[in-house]
Amino acid sequence: MQLRQQSQQQLQHFHTVRLILGDQLNAQHTWYQQVDPKVLYLIAELHQENTYVTHHVQKICAFFSAMAQFASELGAAGHQVRYLTLDDTQGFTDLNALLECFVAETGAIKFEYQRPDEYRLLAQLSQLKLANAVVNCVDTEHFLFPFDEIDREFPQGRHRLMEHFYRRMRKRFNILMTDGKPVGGQWNFDANNRQKLKSQDIKSLPTPLMFGHNVEDILERLQRHGINTMGKADTRLLWPINRIQSLELLQYFCEYCLPAFGRFQDAMTQQHPAQWSLYHSRLSFSLNAKLISSLEVINAVIEHYHANPFIEIAQVEGFVRQILGWREYVRGIYWANMPNYANINALEAKRKLPDYFWHGKTRMNCLHHALSQSLDFAYAHHIQRLMVIGNFCLLTEIAPDEVDKWYLGVYVDAIEWVEMPNTRGMALFADGGIVGTKPYAASGSYINKMSDYCGSCHYKIKERSGALACPLNSLYWRFMDKHRAQLSHNPRIAMLYRTWDKTDETARQAILATAEQHLAQLERL
């Protein structure tokens, strides 16, 4: 197999070929400190990366656009770069086949790649054998917690409390610390950050900063190659596709969203055009593609906090915890437990995803909004992902493999290292407690507490049994009843079982029967 003739003719002889994957767009990597005309950088649109799950069309457009921009910027800086589109790579079944051909045609005697953040790709590249070139792997130089410390910090198969890890990271990098103690006198302000949006709050929601990169050529290319996608296609991409735009979005977050971020980070609404973005940074794609780094995001937020005394520490700490704590933590969980983590199904959930996960048409108003938003924007904020969609999948016993594939495909920021621990671990409790100490199961009352979805829903939020009862209510109690033997020893849950036991037997049976009816007609909820 050879590269397309047009691509082949442009190749010269190089000493070294360096591969850049689509989520390795880190312009600050030491690779780029020196310009060497004998080093050729390869960035490629790969069929294998667009077919292992069905991706949201905006996700593919975002990655392809960012990859092309990065290639252009490297070239402008004097580096030798080859960008291969799907047209160029269509003859290759997988990445290794492409690399064997490409490296051979350049005459390179050295091939280098940055360690992939997905186990699947690391395993694949570890098997790469090149006839005339030495293969070398280097670090991505992106994450704060060193890769070679993961096994020591995260024992395989065991729970490691995120809060303890987060505090050590705060100390290690001296973030929000004063004389060895946390700024504000406490480590965690989560209790301050659970407010519902009131009508006056909704009116003042900021209009999200969106970009408008033309992706018509990418959409046409995807169609020409028969790439199956999901979600709403838009010729104008709203996501940042380069470092400058990512920093612009960071600055926008600091100015317009940070002052209220923590307070409303768990809130949801259906009453504003910005209901999909609220006060969230939407920097996750930029971070996960490595267009910007965790530390510069954290430093920008803290600098803005110091320059604006009206911003409360609770708003800042809540954001820092997501980046410095949770993001680094789930990466550790992922690498410490793969590849077995991908097969864990502690609760033996086996149902398939309902069809409305691909069109959003369900009478459950909370789920309708969370799904529709995901399909429209390739994005949902974390509470929608965890407590609406994830909670629904947990209570209805959707197979973890099904949920993993959907989450990995639908969200623009989804890469397996961050998606799987959040989904299989946090949302589904399929890992049996490696990530969370208890399932994040909730009845409809939680949704009602944090949103305005329930008032206009087809189902009745205050009812637990009957055809019109909120499905989450009966499904919640069915879940707790079914898994009692496994969960009742947890002191955080024991009180719930005392409440259940005090419920009249007739009422309990009606609730459980309603749950079974909902499960029987899952496609029609």
Q: Where are each of the predicted segments found?
A:
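N-terminal beta-strand-loop-alpha-helix module at the start
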Residues: 2-86
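Long alpha-helical, hydrophobic tracts
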Residues: 28, 55-56, 64-68, 73-92, ...
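C-terminal catalytic domain of photolyase/cryptochrome flavoproteins
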Residues: 9-11, 21, 274, 280-525
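Beta-rich, aromatic/charged-enriched effector core domains that present basic-aromatic interfaces
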Residues: 92-239
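Substrate/cofactor-recognition hotspot
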Residues: 15-27, 31, 57, 184-312, ...
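A generic structural motif
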Residues: 44, 134-146, 417-425
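Short His-Asn-centered micro-motif
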Residues: 19-23, 44-45, 84-86, 113-116, ...
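A short acidic (Asp/Glu
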Residues: 28-32, 53-55, 93-96, 121-126, ...
